[in-house]
C-alpha cells in the first residue's frame, strides 16, 4: 500500500502510525526490516516526512481469530423469531477483532441467542449496526438473513429511530439545533474521525434537557450513522461528550468513560411491518453523576 504525505514535519514512524492502520511498534518493525520505502528509498524511523512524499508500506495479513460463545450477562430487551434488541453495557466491544477475541457482545449473543444472521460474516453474526465500546445502550440484532437485509435497508434509508443521551461540556447557546457537517477519517490522525469536506454527509439533531453550568444533559437524534458521529459533531461545535478521551479535553468527568447512552431505538419489524420502539434507562453511574451535577 502507499500513501502520499499531505503535511510534512512528522517522523516517519509517527506518520505511518497516524496515517495508516499500523501501530507505532509495527511501523518501526517494518522500517527496520526495509519494508517501508519513501519515494522508492529505504529511510530510518527518524526521517522527517515532507509534503508530497510517497510512502510505501506492507499491509500485514489479517489474524485468524478464534472465538466462542461465552456466558456473559446480557440484558435482552426484546426477542422474537426474527429480531432481538439488547442493552449493551458500557465498556463492551461489539464484535471480535485483533486484541478483542473474547468478552464481546458477539460472544455473549452466541451464548444467549442461538440463531443469528450471517450476512456480516463469521465475526459479526447478527450485528446490523454498532455503537462504540464506551457507549452503552440499545442495539438491534438480526436472527436471520432476511431480517438483517430489511433492518440494514431501513438504516440506510434513515427510517429507524435512534436517540441518545449525553452529558456534554459547556452550556449550549440554543435549546435545540441541527448539526449538519460531513464526517470522514481525519487527515492528521487516521485512527480518528473528523469533520472534513471530503467526508460523508452527517446530520445530528440535539435538544438540551438540563443545564448544570459547566455541563449540559443533551438528547441527540441521529439521521445518519457515521463512525463516532455524535462524539465528532459535539466536539466540532465546542461541546464534546464528557469523559471522551479521544475527542474531548483531558479535564472532564471521571469514573465512567464517556457519558453517552443509546436510549431509544425504533424500527419497523421486518416480518410484520409493525413499528417497534424501545427505551433503555441510563446506567446507574450516569444517574449518580447527574445527581452530583444538580447539587
Task: List the predicted regions and their residue ranges.
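RNA pseudouridine synthases
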Residues: 1-295
Amino acid at each position: 500500500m502507499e500513501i502520499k504525505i499531505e503535511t510534512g514535519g512528522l517522523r516517519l514512524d509517527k506518520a505511518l502510525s497516524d496515517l495508516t492502520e499500523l501501530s507505532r511498534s509495527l511501523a518501526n518493525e517494518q522500517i527496520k526490516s526495509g519494508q517501508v520505502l519513501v519515494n522508492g528509498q529505504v529511510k530510518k524511523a527518524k526521517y522527517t516526512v515532507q509534503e508530497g512524499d510517497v510512502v510505501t508500506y506492507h499491509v500485514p495479513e489479517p489474524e485468524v481469530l478464534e472465538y466462542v460463545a461465552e456466558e456473559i450477562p446480557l440484558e435482552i430487551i426484546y426477542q422474537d423469531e426474527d429480531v432481538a434488541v439488547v442493552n449493551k453495557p458500557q465498556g463492551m466491544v461489539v464484535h471480535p477483532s485483533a486484541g478483542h477475541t473474547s468478552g464481546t457482545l458477539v460472544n455473549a449473543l452466541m451464548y444467549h441467542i442461538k440463531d443469528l444472521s450471517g450476512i456480516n460474516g463469521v465475526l459479526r453474526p447478527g450485528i446490523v449496526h454498532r455503537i462504540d465500546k464506551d457507549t452503552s445502550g440499545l442495539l438491534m440484532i438480526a436472527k436471520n438473513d432476511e431480517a438483517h437485509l430489511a433492518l440494514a435497508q431501513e438504516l440506510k434509508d434513515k427510517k429507524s429511530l435512534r436517540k441518545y443521551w449525553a452529558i456534554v461540556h459547556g452550556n449550549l447557546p440554543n435549546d435545540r439545533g441541527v448539526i449538519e457537517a460531513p464526517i470522514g477519517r481525519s487527515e492528521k490522525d487516521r485512527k480518528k474521525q473528523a469533520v472534513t469536506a471530503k467526508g460523508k454527509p452527517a446530520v445530528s439533531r440535539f435538544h438540551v434537557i438540563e443545564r448544570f453550568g459547566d455541563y449540559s444533559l443533551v438528547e441527540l437524534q441521529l439521521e445518519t450513522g457515521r463512525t463516532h458521529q455524535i462524539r465528532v459533531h459535539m466536539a466540532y461545535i465546542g461541546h464534546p461528550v464528557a469523559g471522551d478521551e479521544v475527542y474531548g479535553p483531558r479535564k472532564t468527568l471521571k469514573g465512567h468513560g464517556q457519558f453517552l447512552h443509546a436510549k431509544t431505538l425504533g424500527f419497523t419489524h421486518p416480518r410484520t411491518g409493525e413499528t417497534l420502539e424501545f427505551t433503555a434507562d441510563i446506567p446507574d453511574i450516569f444517574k449518580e453523576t447527574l445527581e452530583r451535577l444538580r447539587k
